[in-house]
């Protein structure tokens, strides 16, 4: 009986091990992550720097001309209060501009957590680490589009 009570005591005092997040950086001091949104896939590298953001070799303000897309891109860095501290280089392909901006945002968020694991709770709370799984609904036969039916004529 003493053995059983000792085991119960060990079971109650032992805490489940929290996952340890280790900093993932390559030889050049960069963290790499991929982000996805709709049909777009972004490969993102971040390193400590002056805040320069490059998308497919162009400044992000040239690649994403609409201010809304530029804001989407900067959200994770601003939420983490690290504005102007990282140089971000991304290559993105597939989809349209909105999907590409979302993919780069997702990639930046993941790369930030690899570079600085302490930022994970802040970015998780903001919803930046969650992959947005919404994609275009497929077209069905017998219909004009996914849900729209052909025009109905009584006569």
Swiss-Prot record:
SUPFAM superfamilies with a match to the protein in the record: Ribosomal protein S5 domain 2-like (SSF54211)
GO MF term set: RNA binding; structural constituent of ribosome
Keywords, sorted A to Z: Ribonucleoprotein, Ribosomal protein
Record Gene3D superfamilies: 3.30.230.10
Gene name for this UniProt entry: rpsI
PANTHER family: RIBOSOMAL PROTEIN S9 (PTHR21569), SMALL RIBOSOMAL SUBUNIT PROTEIN US9M (PTHR21569:SF1)
Gene Ontology cellular-component terms listed: cytosolic small ribosomal subunit
Gene Ontology BP terms: translation
Family affiliation: Belongs to the universal ribosomal protein uS9 family.
One Pfam family linked to the record: Ribosomal_S9
The protein, known as: Small ribosomal subunit protein uS9
Coiled-coil segments on the chain, per record: none
């Amino acid at each position: 009986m003493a053995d059983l009570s000792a085991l119960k005591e060990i079971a109650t005092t032992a805490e489940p091990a929290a996952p340890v997040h280790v900093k993932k950086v390559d030889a050049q001091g960069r963290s790499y992550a991929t982000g996805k949104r709709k049909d777009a896939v972004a490969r993102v590298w971040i390193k400590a720097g002056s805040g320069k953001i490059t998308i497919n070799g162009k400044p992000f303000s040239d690649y994403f001309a609409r201010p809304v897309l530029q804001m989407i891109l900067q959200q994770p860095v601003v939420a983490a209060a690290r504005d102007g501290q990282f140089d971000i280089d991304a290559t993105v392909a597939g989809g349209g501009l909105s999907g590409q901006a979302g993919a780069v945002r997702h990639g930046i968020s993941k790369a930030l957590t690899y570079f600085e694991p302490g930022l994970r709770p802040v970015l998780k709370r903001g919803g930046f680490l969650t992959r947005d799984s919404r994609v275009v609904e497929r077209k069905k036969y017998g219909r004009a589009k996914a849900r729209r039916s052909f025009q109905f004529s009584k006569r």
